[in-house]
UniProtKB/Swiss-Prot annotation:
Entry similarity comment: Belongs to the PRPF40 family.
GO molecular function: RNA polymerase binding
Composition skew (Basic residues), residue ranges: 909-924
Subunit organization: Interacts (via the WW domains) with the phosphorylated C-terminal domain of NRPB1 (via CTD domain).
Gene that encodes the chain: PRP40A
Signal peptide boundaries: none
UniProt keyword terms in alphabetical order: mRNA processing, mRNA splicing, Nucleus, Phosphoprotein, Repeat
GO cellular component, one term: mediator complex
Name recorded for this polypeptide: Pre-mRNA-processing protein 40A
Summary of the tissues where the protein is detected: Highly expressed in roots. Expressed in shoots, rosette leaves, cauline leaves, stems and flowers.
Compositional bias (Basic and acidic residues): 805-857, 867-880, 897-908
FF domain residues: 404-458, 471-526, 532-593, 611-674, 679-734, 736-801
Length: 958
């Protein structure tokens, strides 16, 4: 088996077979090799010697979950045995009596002659494993033939040491060396490279193979721990870590328990390995300094590391492995205590103890708990019974299983045969199964616990299913009991129902009272639902009969009211079965159906009307098309004008009488829209033709002139005479409008220039163009005209208007003066008349006063003389003041009126050529309005003068 290539990491279970027979130790005559556990006869064997005690071994890959153990020099350890038929290929097997004795071991009595020679390892890692094989058959008590064995992890280097048994039996013992790589491919065989796209890959120099995945040999203990689980760690772009399960496709933010446990165990194993290496002495050092082997046991130190395939690491469990050693004379065996080994006695470990302690690390990563469980298991097996070296262990051979699944199934069948319950603990189960041969189907405690936990989970599921099925059946029987009870109704209470069913076994089959009540409540709810459904069905039948009755009543129409016929309906038996509200609802539903029928009839009638209206619209469209062909309807036709011509036609009247759809105006606009579109296309073509041939439109052209000018272009484009006439009218209108616009612009410039001339006081009636040109030639108005002759003509017109204004002003001043003189004379005449009248009145008053004052003539005459003199003086002064004010007022009126006339004349001349608004202003300033204003002023003056006269005459104002 050692010559075969290493198995793949996917192999989970591999049965061991007995080693090949016929391979003998070289050069001495040795007996054939037998598997561990075989009890050979006592034969005298020559003392072998080690050829390569620390040679690195080439082993099979470690099965996932294979535990690895560390031992110290003071405690025993159970190590995984490695079965191989590899024989020693180098070194001498002859004894060396002159070799120095070994030191560092606890011995008593004379030292043994060393039967072994320790040779340092000098072979490369690629060479096959060299195990020390004595010339006699090796035997380990308690290890059955073809037992399931697992190899040591890939990063562990061990050598097997077999001390001599004088009785002819030897036991291979694993001796610890520095931790190394025990895999067929060492870390030095792998090289890391980087591909063109930046990805890293690994190349094996020995196998000439490349791999994208990082080999186990190059992994750190932490990476091996991660690789042993189904979880893989990733990092988001934000730097947050999450974990992905490769089996269940599950992602989570928190670190899974198994991954966390694997990392902790890897860290713990690494720390304890370093401590173990620091506290132990290499075995080669003792071999070099000692010539006699004076030990009764050889302690194996196996550093624990992470499993190469599963990544699970275990806590170091230290135990002493006792190897029987005999020397003459015979020494009675002594049982050691607390790991201490006697000087002269050899101890052996019972086969069950070795079997149960072959590996103590479980797949779930338990460390200290596994140690405690293993100690309990050892106590169950007999508390590590030790027997004399000469006793032969009667070991029952375990069954061999082809696969790991079969072994696990056998172990589960053992649990099932013992009838392990789902609430049993491992310690409780261990007492029942430890003596069964199927207990050894799984080698490690972790595998057994894993299978035990799986069995408990399955057992719990089975028990839960059985419990659920039993409860389901009890519930069904309970419901059946309720259905069979005739006294049960929807109004029955639970308290009364309990008294009815308390003696029934089906009632007692449901354990929990709460469940019984829930089942009862559910049944009552279902019973109520059925009763409601039955009542609803009866109600539907009554409503159907009532509906048939309503349909037979001919006096019910769509507009019939309920209040008028409800008394007539109540006499029928089909109405008495229903409530009043139900009868009302049924009546309303029937009325709604009648209304729907009427609406359907209306819809059909409306459809007929719609078709007739559509025919009317089609006839009107035909009429419009005829008018378009005749030229009556064009793109420039307005609806109001066209409607006057159509209003008496039957097609128009038919469409106008339509109640829906397009109106006659809508149809007219649809046609004119198409005509306008064609008109604009023809107009664009004509304008492009005129532009290409450089034809300028003249406002004096007739239609024939325009048509002849573009006749050559009309041969390529068919344009109707109607559209061509419309195009002509539009172009001529545009030309005329442009000319009018230019004329208005020139008139505006002339007005602006004339207004500019008004602003210069230097320009008078006597000014000429040559002298005044320098005043206006820098202005914007003058430059806007651009033609000096036009500006000069406007200037001369302005001078002429000034001359006319001056003449008119002089004439008006003369007329005003004559008028005022005439008014003054008339006013004097009126004043004289008034004065004479007042004199006469005074005379009459005087006469009356004379008659009254005859008796006081003397006194009265004196008083009258004084009074009359004073009044005469006062009247004379007032006459002088009035004349002075009148002269001053007349002069100021003449000046104001002349200035106002000048301003009016200037405004009239500046707005002589304006628009309607300017004309209206001109009209407001016409001579007629001036005469009216003058009349108003004269009236005011006359009233003012008359008021002054009244004040002068004295009696009122004074």
């Amino acid at each position: 088996m050692a010559n075969n290539p290493p198995q793949s990491s996917g192999t989970q279970f591999r049965p061991m077979v007995p080693g090949q027979q016929g391979q003998h130790f070289v050069p001495a005559a040795s007996q054939p090799f037998h598997p561990y556990g075989h009890v050979p006869p006592n034969v005298q064997s020559q003392p072998p010697q080690y050829s390569q005690p620390i040679q690195q071994q080439q082993l099979f890959p470690v099965r996932p979950g294979q535990p690895v153990h560390i031992t110290s020099s003071s405690q025993a350890v159970s190590v995984p045995y490695i079965q191989t038929n590899k024989i020693l290929t180098s070194g001498s097997t002859q004894p060396q009596p002159n070799a120095p004795p070994m030191t560092g071991f606890a011995t008593s009595g004379p030292p043994f002659s060393s039967p072994y020679t320790f040779v340092p390892s000098s072979y490369p890692q690629q060479q096959p494993t060299s195990l020390v094989q004595p010339n006699s058959q090796m035997h380990v008590a308690g290890v059955p033939p073809a037992a399931n064995t697992w190899p040591v992890p890939v990063n562990q280097s061990t050598s097997l040491v077999s001390p001599v048994q004088q009785t002819g039996q030897q036991t291979p013992v694993a001796v610890s060396t520095d931790p190394g790589n025990l895999t067929p491919q060492s870390a030095s065989d792998w090289q890391e490279h980087t591909s063109a796209d930046g990805r890293k890959y690994y190349y094996n120099k020995r196998t000439k193979q490349s791999n994208w995945e990082k080999p186990l040999e190059l992994m750190t203990p932490l990476e091996r721990a991660d690789a042993s689980t189904v979880w893989k760690e990733f990092t988001t772009p934000e730097g947050k870590k999450y974990y992905y399960n490769k089996v269940t496709k599950e992602s989570k933010w928190t670190i899974p328990e198994d991954l966390k446990l694997a990392r902790e165990q890897a860290q713990l194993a690494s720390e304890k390995t370093s401590l173990s290496e620091a506290g132990s002495t290499p075995l080669s050092h003792h071999a070099a300094s000692s010539s006699d082997l004076a030990v009764s046991t050889v302690t194996s130190v196996v550093p624990s590391t992470s499993s190469a395939l599963t990544g699970h690491s275990s806590s170091p469990i230290q135990a002493g492995l006792a190897v029987p050693v005999t020397r003459p004379p015979s020494v009675a065996p002594v049982t050691p205590t607390s790991g201490a080994i006697s000087d002269t006695e050899a101890t052996t470990i019972k086969g069950d103890n070795l079997s149960s302690r072959g590996a103590d690390d479980s797949n779930d990563g338990a460390t200290a708990q596994n140690n405690e469980a293993e100690n309990k298991e050892m106590s169950v097996n007999g508390k590590a019974n030790l027997s004399p070296a000469g006793d032969k262990a009667n070991v029952e051979e375990p069954m061999v299983y082809a696969t790991k699944q079969e072994a696990k199934a056998a172990f589960k069948s053992l649990l099932e045969s013992v009838n392990v319950h789902s609430d049993w603990t491992w310690e409780q189960t261990l007492k029942e199964i430890v003596h069964d041969k199927r207990y050894g189907a799984l080698r490690t405690l972790g595998e057994r616990k894993q299978a035990f936990n799986e069995y408990l989970g399955q057992r719990k599921k089975v028990e839960a299913e059985e419990r659920r099925r039993r409860q389901k059946k009890a519930r069904e029987e309970f419901v059946k009991m309720l259905e069979e009870c005739e006294e049960l109704s929807s109004s029955l209470k639970w308290s009364k129902a309990m008294s009815l069913f308390e003696n029934d076994q089906r009632f007692k089959a449901v354990d929990r009272p709460r469940d019984r009540e829930d089942l009862f409540d559910n049944y009552i709810v279902e019973l109520e639902r059925k009763e409601r459904e039955k009542a609803a069905e009866e109600h539907r039948q009554y409503m159907a009969d009532y509906r048939k009755f309503l349909e037979t009543c001919d006096y019910i129409k769509a507009g019939t009211q309920w209040r008028k016929i409800q008394d007539r309906l109540e006499d029928d038996d089909r109405c008495s079965c229903l409530e009043k509200i139900d009868r009302l609802i049924g009546f309303e539903e029937y009325i709604l159906d009648l209304e729907k029928e009427e609406e359907e009839l209306k819809r059909v009638e409306k459809e007929h009307v719609r078709r007739a209206e559509r025919k009317n619209r089609d006839a009107f469209r035909t009429l419009l098309e005829e008018h378009v062909a005749a030229g009556i309807l064009t793109a420039k036709t307005y609806w109001l004008d066209y409607c006057i011509e159509l209003k008496d036609l039957p097609q128009y009247q038919a469409v106008a009488s339509n109640t829906s759809g397009s109106t006659p105006k809508d149809l007219f606009e649809d046609v004119t829209e198409e005509l306008e579109k064609q008109y604009h296309e023809d107009k664009s073509y004509v304008k492009d033709a005129m532009k290409s041939r450089k034809i300028s439109m003249v406002s004096s052209w007739l239609f024939e002139d325009f048509k002849s000018a573009i006749s050559e272009d009309l041969s390529t484009q068919q344009i109707s005479d109607i559209n061509l006439k419309l195009i002509y009218d539009d172009l001529v209108g545009r030309v005329k409008e442009k000319e009018e616009k230019e004329a208005r612009k020139l008139q505006r410039l002339a007005e602006e220039f004339t207004n500019l001339l008004h602003t210069f006081k230097e320009i008078t009636v006597a000014s000429n163009w040559e002298d005044s040109k320098q005043l206006v030639e820098e202005s914007q108005e003058y430059r806007s005209i651009g033609d000096e002759s036009v500006s000069q003509g406007l200037f001369e017109e302005y001078i002429t208007s000034l001359q006319e204004k001056a003449k008119e002003k002089e004439r008006k001043r003369d007329e005003e003066k004559v008028r005022k003189e005439k008014e003054r004379d008339e006013k004097e005449k009126r004043k004289d008349k008034d004065k004479e009248r007042r004199e006469k009145e005074r005379e009459r008053e005087k006469e009356k006063g004379k008659e009254r004052s005859k008796r006081e003539e003397s006194d009265g005459e004196t008083a009258m003389d004084v009074s009359e003199g004073h009044k005469d003086e006062k009247r004379k002064g007032k006459d002088r003041d009035r004349k002075h004010r009148r002269r001053h007022h007349n002069n100021s009126d003449e000046d104001v009126s002349s200035d106002r006339d000048d301003r009016d004349e200037s405004k009239k001349s500046s707005r002589k050529h304006g628009n309607d608004r300017k004309k209206s202003r001109k009209h407001a300033n016409s001579p007629e309005s001036e005469s009216e204003n003058r009349h108003k002023r004269q009236k005011k003056e006359s009233s003012r003068r008359s008021g002054n006269d009244e004040l002068e005459d004295g009696e009122v104002g004074e």
